[in-house]
Amino acid sequence: NQLADGSWGDAGTFSIFDRILNTLACVVALRSWNIHPHKTDKGIWFMKKNMCRIDEENLEHMPIGFEVALPSLIDIAKKLEIDIPTQTRGLQEIYARREIKLKKIPRDIMHQVPTTLLHSLEGMAGLKWEKLLKLQSEDGSFLFSPSSTAFALQQTRDHNCLKYLTNHIHKFNGGVPNVYPVDLFEHLWAVDRLQRLGLSRYFEPEIEECIAYVHRQWTEKGICWARNSQVEDIDDTAMGFRLLRLHGYEVSADVFRHFKSDGGEFFCFKGQSTQAVTGMYNLYRASQLMFPGENILVDAARFSANFLQLKRAKNDLLDKWIITKDLPGEVGYALDVPWYASLPRVETRFYLDQYGGDDDVWIGKTLYRMPYVNNNKYLELAKLDYNNCQALHQQEWQNILKWYRSCSLGEFGMTERSLLQTYYVAAASVFEPEKSQERLAWAKTAILMETITSHFEFQQLSRDQKRAFITEFEHDSILKYTNGGRYKRRSSLVGTLVRTLNHLSLDILLAHGRDIHQPLKNAWCKWLNSWEEGGDAELLVRTLNLMSGGGRRRRWASEELLSSNPKHEQLLKATIGVCDKLRLFLRRKVQGGNGCMNATGMTTVEIESEMRELVKLVVTRSSSEDLDSEIKQNFLTIARSFYYAAYCNQGTINFHIAKVLFEK
């Protein structure tokens, strides 16, 4: 495995930290065994030539425990009379960092309770092994580190250490990873990548299995990268918390109290030397799933957002755990578009540019790859899927445009720009090809609501004229054809509304044998009679639920059955309430009022509070008679679309429209 330049390490990515550490370890091993002297000499030559480059490397990319492991290896090399330069400025910095780290976790503490130093024992002198062996993991390792465990075996001849190493040497055909297992980390990050790439719908059983596996390992103190760990970290805990909560599992936000110092700072590990960008990034993402009253998540959101904003302002968004294609882009999107406002297709379109596939490299004790998390197959499939959806959306948009023109909706005040934005919001929220009926029903419903509102307001219709419009719709909803099929109506806008509802109802009747015409008409009658009071969200939710039936578990539950469910009424009330406030907020913003937002995603305190309550209603499972998750998600989907319109300025929305619908 020696590379052409005499070094050992990751062949695909050059990191001087990785190459020096691996090369010195291999040279020490070969010299100890007194074999392959020519390879040893090539390795020494590489180190003599490149040791001075340590001070050129970005310290954020220093491998885990490097500041402890390298000095220990150098001490061993000196005993073996291996001639390598040790007086470089970069090495002096490494030694200084070692002292800082060892002071953060004193020797007496590391012998009493599990700490991250268990992961980096190799070469440390003066250890009390009889005490450390009591901190051994269940699998025989020292915090799942083969190298740390190998050093322990060398010092103690412990049978469990030998068993751990032997099992993994056989498993990996003579070698071992830098850390193993990584089962929780792998399960969580694979799910996260599939979701952000827009592929999760293809792997729902596998994802449910992954999430259930993580839930079985969950503890009130959190988790780390592997099961049965006595040490927890905020990165895996935050990702686990977020995904478990999204999938309906009950997890307490109090878990994050274990990662908060007395001074109010959040940390990944106790005694850490530096703060990881991705750890704070995932804490920030987790905090956006907060429920009412979860003050620890309010603190977490504030701390992580401030940390990330400061890093971004300094152009310092480098991470100590991963070298990825566009981490600044990922963090920037999260800060600029909070989760409430993040429409699924928008997130996926940006992430397709940010995801590095095979080229993303993780930083552990050495550089390593996570093929189930980062691979080109995911990226290739995601791009194919996105392009397929985009092509369908573009065709639907052309059909919407034809419908708009044939119905002369422009004469009633509906502009083509508003038409495009309305369709885009529906398509970016409900994007799947198989949900075309729901998407088009949403788009046409929203378009007609805006058109009718514009007609009523800007034509300055009298109360009697509005009443006549509503009466005509209420009493004339059965299609009548005369003169060779030409549709007759006193009001062409009423005619368009009636035809649209009949068309939507007929689609469902033909596809699923379900007649939704009457409940759809009832929903419109309710909106028309109270349009000045809002009610847009209620009409959209009812339309979406009627078009999608009762969800996957209870396909085509009746409107009466849905409405009789107490959870349905709670969701409807919460959605209407927050959407009405968002509509008012948007109107004030457009009119130059006092609506304001800050970088943590705030609109108003009241709106944020009500969004948290809605999220809680949607993601929690109340009982076996709970609504289907797809139906519950419809409420949140509509609310998030309102939040998006209120949060993003018009320039941002226009940019998103171009990128999501039209950019290849």
Curated annotation (Swiss-Prot):
Pathway: Secondary metabolite biosynthesis; terpenoid biosynthesis
Catalytic activity: (2E,6E,10E)-geranylgeranyl diphosphate = ent-copalyl diphosphate
Top enzyme category: isomerase
Gene Ontology molecular function, alphabetical: ent-copalyl diphosphate synthase activity; magnesium ion binding; terpene synthase activity
Keyword rRNA processing: no
Pfam families recorded: Terpene_synth (PF01397)
Cofactors: Mg(2+)
Gene Ontology annotations for the cellular component aspect, listed alphabetically: chloroplast
Gene3D superfamilies from the UniProt entry: 1.50.10.160, Farnesyl Diphosphate Synthase, Terpene synthase, N-terminal domain
Residues that hold Mg(2+) according to the record: 233, 235
Enzyme nomenclature, EC number: 5.5.1.13
InterPro entries in UniProt: Isoprenoid_synthase_dom_sf, Terpene_synth_N, Terpene_synth_N_sf, Terpene_synthase-like, Terpenoid_cyclase/PrenylTrfase
Keywords recorded for this protein, A-Z: Chloroplast, Isomerase, Magnesium, Metal-binding, Plastid
Motif (DXDD motif): 233-236
Annotated binding of substrate, by residue: 101, 320
Taxonomy, superkingdom: Eukaryota
Biological process annotations from GO: gibberellin biosynthetic process; miltiradiene biosynthetic process; terpenoid biosynthetic process
Record remark: domains: The Asp-Xaa-Asp-Asp (DXDD) motif is important for the catalytic activity, presumably through binding to Mg(2+).
Alphabetical list of PANTHER family matching this protein: ENT-COPALYL DIPHOSPHATE SYNTHASE, CHLOROPLASTIC (PTHR31739:SF4)
Misc: Abietane diterpenoids (e.g. miltiradiene, abietatriene and ferruginol) accumulate specifically in the periderm of roots. The ent-kaurene diterpenoid oridonin, main constituent of Isodon rubescens, accumulates in leaves.
Task of the protein: Involved in the biosynthesis of ent-kaurene diterpenoids natural products such as oridonin, miltiradiene, eriocalyxin B and nezukol, known to exhibit antitumor, anti-inflammatory and antibacterial activities. Catalyzes the conversion of (2E,6E,10E)-geranylgeranyl diphosphate (GGPP) to ent-copalyl diphosphate (ent-CPP).
Designated name of the protein: Ent-copalyl diphosphate synthase 5
Native organism: Isodon rubescens (Rabdosia rubescens)
